[in-house]
């Protein structure tokens, strides 16, 4: 409703496309006044805009020249995931593209990130889990059934949701049942289905069944959200990219004291994969490969990881965090409080050793 054309047949490639006279001033005024009224009547009310053109200022306060919505939906993210699932081989999942899509937003607007919504759950479309596993969901979801397609689907489902949820700058959205990989679509009674109620439901019992794999996804989602909630103002913490490499298919970023590491490669695991992070000791707090979540348990999460000192990055206050990254897994590590940790002591000792060596070499040169 922001445009006389409803945005149909228009490409929004530059800011000039948002201010070319095609905008419906009455509609914009209506939305602005509506937001102003809503927040005056109820200061705790939240308004969210679902808009595809990317109109600037939509989720900016009226006092700051915006339209007054509290959030806008990050509609590019679910479109990206569906596109990559439909068109790309696992070997062609590029972390640089994933990073761009999940963090592509204006700094002054808060967004609601989501991997999928009701659009994918309704009849006629497919949810992420169904695109990953398809009909094998009906035959191989027993907890003790090690079926390749199901194992792949569970692993990627967790990784997709983790990277989407932990790169938010506003909020995270989930459509009921998708968090545990509900196997069927939703179809409300209508003439086309004979007014049937068969698919007008969510089978909540699936996630509670100990003999089925749905509980693995449900448990992971619960732990993931608990981690996010445990960090004060998580959504406001800067998202800082540590590393991405499309060849390795590895992505890493930081928020506060947390490091998020993803290996999207379907076949390549890495030993001692180095990432430059603030020096210290890191402990794994969430791992998609944890057996509790249907993973293979290929890493020992009880191990604390100490960064290695490198004089080249001393001024940047960074050291090498060396990790084992199994294929198609992701982990979250927390930097422990710096109570003169062993890694710090090692770093200081290494610095003194390097300085002593340099002084010794300099003294030799002076003698010569």
Residue ranges of model-derived segments:
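Catalytic cores of secreted or luminal carbohydrate-active enzymes
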Residues: 203, 209-231
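C-terminal beta-strand-rich structural cap/linker in extracellular carbohydrate-active enzymes
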Residues: 256, 301-340
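Conserved alpha/beta catalytic core and glycan-binding cleft of carbohydrate-active enzymes
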Residues: 9-200, 229-274, 278-281, 285-289, ...
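Polybasic, low-complexity intrinsically disordered segments
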Residues: 341-346
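Short acidic catalytic loops
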Residues: 1-2
């Amino acid at each position: 409703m922001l445009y006389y054309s409803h945005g149909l047949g228009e490409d929004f490639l530059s800011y000039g496309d948002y201010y070319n006279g095609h905008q419906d001033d009455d509609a914009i005024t209506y939305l602005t006044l509506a937001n102003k009224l809503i927040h005056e009547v109820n200061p705790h009310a939240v308004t969210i805009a679902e808009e595809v053109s990317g109109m600037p200022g939509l989720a900016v306060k009226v006092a700051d020249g915006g339209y007054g919505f509290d959030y806008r939906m990050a509609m590019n993210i679910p479109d990206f995931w569906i596109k990559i699932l439909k068109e790309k081989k696992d070997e062609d999942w590029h972390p640089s593209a994933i990073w761009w899509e999940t963090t592509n937003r204006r700094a002054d607007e808060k967004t609601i990130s989501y991997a999928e919504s009701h659009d994918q759950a309704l009849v006629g479309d497919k949810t992420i889990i169904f695109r990953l596993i398809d009909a094998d969901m009906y035959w191989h979801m027993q907890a003790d059934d090690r079926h390749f397609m199901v194992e792949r689907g569970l692993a990627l489902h967790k990784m997709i949701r983790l990277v989407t949820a932990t790169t938010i700058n506003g909020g995270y959205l989930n459509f009921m049942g998708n968090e545990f990989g509900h196997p069927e679509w939703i179809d409300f009674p209508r003439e086309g289905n004979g007014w049937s109620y068969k698919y007008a439901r969510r089978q909540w019992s699936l996630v509670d069944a100990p003999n089925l794999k749905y509980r693995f996804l449900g448990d992971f989602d619960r732990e993931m959200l608990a981690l996010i909630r445990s960090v004060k103002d998580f959504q406001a913490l800067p998202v800082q990219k540590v590393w991405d490499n499309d060849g390795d298919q590895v992505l890493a970023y930081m928020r506060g004291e947390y490091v998020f590491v993803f290996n999207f490669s379907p076949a390549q695991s890495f030993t001692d994969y180095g990432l430059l992070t603030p020096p210290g000791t890191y402990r794994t707090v969430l791992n998609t490969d944890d057996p509790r979540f249907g993973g293979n348990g290929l890493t020992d999460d009880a191990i604390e990881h100490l960064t290695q000192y490198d004089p080249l990055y001393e001024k940047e206050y960074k050291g090498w965090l060396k990790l084992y990254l199994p294929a198609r897994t992701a982990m979250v590590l927390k930097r422990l409080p710096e109570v003169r940790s062993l890694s710090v002591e090692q770093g200081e000792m290494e610095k003194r050793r390097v300085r002593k060596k340099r002084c010794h070499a300099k003294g030799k040169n002076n003698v010569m």
